[in-house]
Amino acid sequence: MSLYIGLMSGTSMDGIDAALLELPSNQLIHGITKQYSDDVRRNLDDLIIGNHLTLASICQLNTLIGREFAEAVRQLLIEIKVHPKEIQAIGSHGQTVCHDTSGNIPYTLQLGCGHTISSLTGITVVADFRTRDLVNGGQGAPFAPLYHQQIFSKVNESVAVVNIGGIANVTFIAKNQMTRGWDIGPGNCLMDAWIYKNKGALFDKNGVWASQGEVIHPLLEYLLQDPFFHLDSPKSIGKEYFSLSWLQKHLKPDYTPADIQATLLALTAHTIAETILNESGEIKQLYLCGGGAHNTHLKESLARLLPGITVKSIAELGISPDYLEAMMFAWLAAQTINQIPVNLASITGAKGIAILGAVYPIIKSY
C-alpha cells in the first residue's frame, strides 16, 4: 500500500481540493476542500478576469498559491491523522491562469510553486504536468480521461464521463478501444461568473436561478456558432477564453439576468449533449463528475436532451464526484515517481508516451 496526495484547483477557482489516495487500489481515504483566502481569490480574479497580467503579480501569486496548497495538505493530514513521512508524494495541478494551444507557440501556465509546497509540507511534490504534453505536440489537457480509464478498466459497455468544472471535458470509454477525450467548452465558468456579477454568489446552487429564467434562443444559437465548438478533437480551451467579456459581446440591453443565466446553462447542456450524440448512438450511460454533477437543473436538462441515455452522477458508483480530479493527480504523481509513462495520443494528440511533470524532491530522514 502506498499513499499519495492529489491537489487540484480547477477553472472554477472555487477552492483547493486535496485527496489522500491509496494505491494501487485507487481508494479515496479522505478529501477536503480549502477555500482560497479572500486576497488570493481577489488577485486571481484580477489576473484572469481583469487581465492584469503584471510580472510581479504572477510571481507573488505563484508563491501565495503554493502556500495555500501546502496549507490544504496540512489540514488534510491533521484531519486523517497521517504523518507527512507516510506520504510518497504530492501531485499538484496548480491553478491555471492561462492556457492557449491555438497559435504557433502553444502555452500554459499553472501557479502554485512546487518548491514552496514541498518545503512547507516536507513531502516530495510532482507538478507542472501539462508542459511536457504541449512540448510533445498535445493540447496539454484534459488529463481526466487517463484516470477515468483506470476507474472503468473493467467496463463491458460503452460509457461517457463528463467532468463539469469551469470547463467541461468528456471521456469516451469502450471495451477493447482506445480511450478518447477532449474539452467540450464552458461547464460552470460562465454561469459562475454571471451569478457572481449579478448576485455576488460563487455559483448557482442546483441551477435554481437558471430555472427561474427563460432560454433566449437567438442568443443560444449565436453562442453555439463560436469556432471552438466546431473544431475537431482533440482540443482544449481555458477559462480566459469563455469569459464574461466573451459573453457580453453578444448581449442586448433587453435581456434579463435570469434569462441570460438560463441560456448559459442551456449552452453547457447543449454542447455536452451534442458531443455525446455524435458518438453514433453507442453511449447508453453518461456519468457526471465535478461541481456540475450537483446541479440538478443541469442534470435534468441533459436527461431531456439525451433520451435513451441514462444520466447519473459518478457518486452512484461510490466515487466522489468532487475529489475525482484531485485523486487523478495523486495517481499521476505515482506514475511519475515510479517512472511509468502515460499515453495521451488519443486524448490530447501528443506524440508517443511520456512521463509527465517536474519533481520537487524532499530528502526523507528516518
From Swiss-Prot:
Keyword Ribosomal protein: no
Enzyme nomenclature, EC number: 2.7.1.170
A single BP term in Gene Ontology: 1,6-anhydro-N-acetyl-beta-muramic acid catabolic process
GO MF term set: ATP binding; kinase activity; phosphotransferase activity, alcohol group as acceptor
CDD domains assigned to the protein according to its UniProt record, in alphabetical order: ASKHA_NBD_ANMK (cd24050)
Associated pathway: Amino-sugar metabolism; 1,6-anhydro-N-acetylmuramate degradation; Cell wall biogenesis; peptidoglycan recycling
Catalytic activity line of the entry: 1,6-anhydro-N-acetyl-beta-muramate + ATP + H2O = N-acetyl-D-muramate 6-phosphate + ADP + H(+)
Enzyme class: transferase
Residues involved in ATP binding: G10, T11, S12, M13, D14, G15, I16, D17
Keyword annotations of the record: ATP-binding, Carbohydrate metabolism, Kinase, Nucleotide-binding, Transferase
Family membership noted in the UniProt record: Belongs to the anhydro-N-acetylmuramic acid kinase family.
Cross-referenced PANTHER family: ANHYDRO-N-ACETYLMURAMIC ACID KINASE
Function as written in the Swiss-Prot or TrEMBL entry: Catalyzes the specific phosphorylation of 1,6-anhydro-N-acetylmuramic acid (anhMurNAc) with the simultaneous cleavage of the 1,6-anhydro ring, generating MurNAc-6-P. Is required for the utilization of anhMurNAc either imported from the medium or derived from its own cell wall murein, and thus plays a role in cell wall recycling.
Protein name: Anhydro-N-acetylmuramic acid kinase
